[in-house]
Protein backbone atom coordinates (compact mmCIF):
# COMPACT_ATOMS: atom_id res chain seq x y z
CA UNK A 1 0.00 0.00 0.00
CA UNK A 2 1.07 3.61 -0.45
CA UNK A 3 0.60 6.37 2.08
CA UNK A 4 1.53 10.02 2.03
CA UNK A 5 2.43 12.34 4.85
CA UNK A 6 4.87 14.93 6.04
CA UNK A 7 7.91 13.80 7.98
CA UNK A 8 8.51 16.38 10.65
CA UNK A 9 11.31 15.92 13.13
CA UNK A 10 10.06 16.81 16.60
CA UNK A 11 6.42 17.24 15.57
CA UNK A 12 5.55 18.65 19.00
CA UNK A 13 2.00 18.46 20.34
CA UNK A 14 -0.46 15.84 19.16
CA UNK A 15 -4.16 15.90 18.30
CA UNK A 16 -6.38 12.83 18.53
CA UNK A 17 -6.96 10.93 15.27
CA UNK A 18 -4.13 12.69 13.39
CA UNK A 19 -1.16 10.66 12.14
CA UNK A 20 2.35 12.05 12.54
CA UNK A 21 5.57 10.81 10.92
CA UNK A 22 8.90 11.25 12.64
CA UNK A 23 12.38 10.09 11.77
CA UNK A 24 14.36 8.84 14.75
CA UNK A 25 16.92 11.06 16.43
CA UNK A 26 18.68 8.50 18.60
CA UNK A 27 17.45 10.37 21.67
CA UNK A 28 14.03 10.74 23.31
CA UNK A 29 11.51 13.11 21.72
CA UNK A 30 8.42 14.29 23.61
CA UNK A 31 4.96 14.90 22.19
CA UNK A 32 2.43 16.56 24.55
CA UNK A 33 -1.31 15.99 24.45
CA UNK A 34 -4.18 16.69 26.83
CA UNK A 35 -7.13 14.64 28.03
CA UNK A 36 -10.28 16.59 28.91
CA UNK A 37 -12.07 13.79 30.81
CA UNK A 38 -11.55 10.20 31.96
CA UNK A 39 -10.79 8.20 28.81
CA UNK A 40 -9.41 5.06 27.25
CA UNK A 41 -6.56 6.31 25.07
CA UNK A 42 -5.19 4.04 22.35
CA UNK A 43 -1.79 4.78 20.85
CA UNK A 44 -0.65 3.35 17.53
CA UNK A 45 3.04 3.48 16.70
CA UNK A 46 4.41 1.84 13.56
CA UNK A 47 8.18 1.44 13.13
CA UNK A 48 8.24 1.49 9.34
CA UNK A 49 11.83 0.64 8.30
CA UNK A 50 12.42 -3.12 8.60
CA UNK A 51 16.21 -2.66 8.54
CA UNK A 52 16.33 -0.22 11.44
CA UNK A 53 16.37 -0.77 15.17
CA UNK A 54 13.67 -0.98 17.81
CA UNK A 55 11.58 2.04 18.82
CA UNK A 56 10.71 2.54 22.52
CA UNK A 57 7.78 4.54 23.90
CA UNK A 58 6.18 5.44 27.23
CA UNK A 59 3.68 7.94 28.70
CA UNK A 60 4.33 10.69 31.24
CA UNK A 61 1.84 12.84 33.18
CA UNK A 62 2.43 16.38 34.40
CA UNK A 63 1.93 16.55 38.18
CA UNK A 64 2.81 19.63 40.23
CA UNK A 65 4.87 21.03 37.36
CA UNK A 66 6.96 17.85 37.01
CA UNK A 67 6.68 15.07 34.43
CA UNK A 68 6.07 11.68 36.05
CA UNK A 69 6.34 8.43 34.14
CA UNK A 70 3.12 6.38 34.45
CA UNK A 71 3.89 3.17 32.58
CA UNK A 72 6.57 0.72 31.51
CA UNK A 73 8.37 1.06 28.21
CA UNK A 74 6.66 -0.36 25.14
CA UNK A 75 8.96 -1.93 22.56
CA UNK A 76 8.00 -1.51 18.88
CA UNK A 77 9.88 -3.86 16.56
CA UNK A 78 11.04 -2.77 13.08
CA UNK A 79 8.52 -3.23 10.25
CA UNK A 80 5.75 -3.72 12.79
CA UNK A 81 2.51 -2.06 11.85
CA UNK A 82 -0.39 -1.35 14.12
CA UNK A 83 1.40 -1.86 17.42
CA UNK A 84 -1.24 -0.51 19.78
CA UNK A 85 -1.19 0.11 23.49
CA UNK A 86 -4.10 1.40 25.56
CA UNK A 87 -4.15 3.42 28.78
CA UNK A 88 -6.95 4.51 31.07
CA UNK A 89 -6.15 8.19 31.69
CA UNK A 90 -7.77 10.84 33.85
CA UNK A 91 -8.12 14.52 32.93
CA UNK A 92 -4.75 16.19 32.59
CA UNK A 93 -1.63 17.01 30.59
CA UNK A 94 0.41 14.11 29.21
CA UNK A 95 3.22 13.48 26.80
CA UNK A 96 4.29 10.54 24.70
CA UNK A 97 8.03 9.87 24.86
CA UNK A 98 9.55 8.11 21.83
CA UNK A 99 13.13 6.94 21.42
CA UNK A 100 14.08 5.60 17.99
CA UNK A 101 17.36 5.03 16.13
CA UNK A 102 18.33 7.69 13.60
CA UNK A 103 17.56 5.31 10.73
CA UNK A 104 13.98 4.56 11.83
CA UNK A 105 10.80 6.24 10.59
CA UNK A 106 7.76 6.07 12.89
CA UNK A 107 4.08 6.73 12.22
CA UNK A 108 2.35 7.86 15.42
CA UNK A 109 -1.32 8.43 16.21
CA UNK A 110 -3.77 8.14 19.09
CA UNK A 111 -7.50 8.01 19.65
CA UNK A 112 -9.42 8.80 22.80
CA UNK A 113 -12.85 7.61 23.94
CA UNK A 114 -14.34 8.95 27.14
CA UNK A 115 -15.45 6.45 29.77
CA UNK A 116 -17.91 7.18 32.56
CA UNK A 117 -17.10 6.26 36.11
CA UNK A 118 -20.47 4.58 36.72
CA UNK A 119 -19.16 1.59 38.60
CA UNK A 120 -20.06 -0.09 41.89
CA UNK A 121 -17.40 -0.03 44.59
CA UNK A 122 -19.62 -1.86 47.13
CA UNK A 123 -21.18 -5.31 46.89
CA UNK A 124 -24.58 -3.88 47.84
CA UNK A 125 -24.52 -1.56 44.81
CA UNK A 126 -23.24 -4.13 42.29
CA UNK A 127 -23.95 -3.34 38.65
CA UNK A 128 -26.32 -5.87 37.03
CA UNK A 129 -25.30 -7.57 33.80
CA UNK A 130 -28.28 -8.94 31.85
CA UNK A 131 -28.41 -12.23 29.95
CA UNK A 132 -26.41 -11.93 26.71
CA UNK A 133 -25.29 -8.52 27.92
CA UNK A 134 -21.86 -7.12 28.42
CA UNK A 135 -20.15 -4.29 30.18
CA UNK A 136 -16.76 -2.69 29.91
CA UNK A 137 -14.90 -0.06 31.83
CA UNK A 138 -11.37 1.04 32.53
CA UNK A 139 -9.05 1.44 35.44
CA UNK A 140 -7.12 4.66 35.19
CA UNK A 141 -3.55 4.91 36.35
CA UNK A 142 -3.46 4.67 40.13
CA UNK A 143 -6.93 3.14 40.62
CA UNK A 144 -6.74 0.00 42.75
CA UNK A 145 -10.20 -0.53 44.20
CA UNK A 146 -12.49 -3.48 43.39
CA UNK A 147 -15.52 -3.27 41.11
CA UNK A 148 -18.71 -5.26 41.73
CA UNK A 149 -21.03 -6.86 39.16
CA UNK A 150 -23.96 -9.26 39.51
CA UNK A 151 -25.78 -11.66 37.21
CA UNK A 152 -29.13 -13.39 37.69
CA UNK A 153 -29.76 -17.03 36.87
CA UNK A 154 -33.42 -17.73 36.07
CA UNK A 155 -33.28 -21.50 35.54
CA UNK A 156 -31.28 -24.29 37.11
CA UNK A 157 -31.82 -26.50 34.05
CA UNK A 158 -29.93 -24.31 31.59
CA UNK A 159 -26.19 -23.83 31.51
CA UNK A 160 -24.88 -20.30 31.44
CA UNK A 161 -21.36 -19.29 30.55
CA UNK A 162 -19.75 -16.22 32.03
CA UNK A 163 -16.83 -14.89 30.01
CA UNK A 164 -14.44 -12.56 31.76
CA UNK A 165 -11.66 -10.79 29.94
CA UNK A 166 -9.04 -8.20 30.58
CA UNK A 167 -6.61 -6.15 28.58
CA UNK A 168 -3.77 -4.71 30.55
CA UNK A 169 -0.72 -2.59 30.28
CA UNK A 170 1.48 -1.90 33.24
CA UNK A 171 1.19 1.44 34.88
Each model region followed by its residue ranges:
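Non-catalytic extracellular/lumenal accessory regions of secreted precursors
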Residues: 1-32, 37, 110-157
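Extracellular and select intracellular beta-sandwich modules with Ser/Thr-enriched
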Residues: 104-108
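Acidic, Ser/Thr/Pro-rich low-complexity intrinsically disordered segments
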Residues: 21-93, 99-101, 140-171
Amino acid sequence: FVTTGVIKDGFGSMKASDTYYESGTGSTTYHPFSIKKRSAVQFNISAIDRNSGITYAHIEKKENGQWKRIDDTVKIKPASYDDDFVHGLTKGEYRLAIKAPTTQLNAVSYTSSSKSKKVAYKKSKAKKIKLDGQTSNIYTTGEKTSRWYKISITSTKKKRILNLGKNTVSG
